[in-house]
Amino acid sequence: MEQTLEQDFDFLVLATSIQVLATEHRFEKWNNIPKDRTRLINLLNKLPKQKLIISGDRHRGGIYKLDNLIEITSSSLNRGSSYQSETDALLIGKTYSQNNYGLLTFNQNSVLVELIDQDNNILESISISF
């Protein structure tokens, strides 16, 4: 992976099936394998350009931030969660248990990251400049 990340890019989107930044819930996450999580975060932090982590498989959505790393988790569009609230020190805003999806809109020098419900209402958003 390190060799791949040495290639030139304007903006990096890293996709993972489980959350990287979330630490406080009891479900599967990179924090359950702390050495690998630390290695991945350190590797991403070394990159000079902006990056975004996208993840899913939580049956809820949210946006997380650690230093200059941002992660959007979205899922699911057809089967939300019955758990109504969840917190995390790295969470921006709150998590959403209703059906949702993530949308990335790339512009000349920025990416708009949105978490949207099934009725197309924006639940959370953040803009990342690069």
Predicted regions and their residues:
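Long, structured stretches of catalytic cores involved in phosphate-ester chemistry, encompassing
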Residues: 1-130
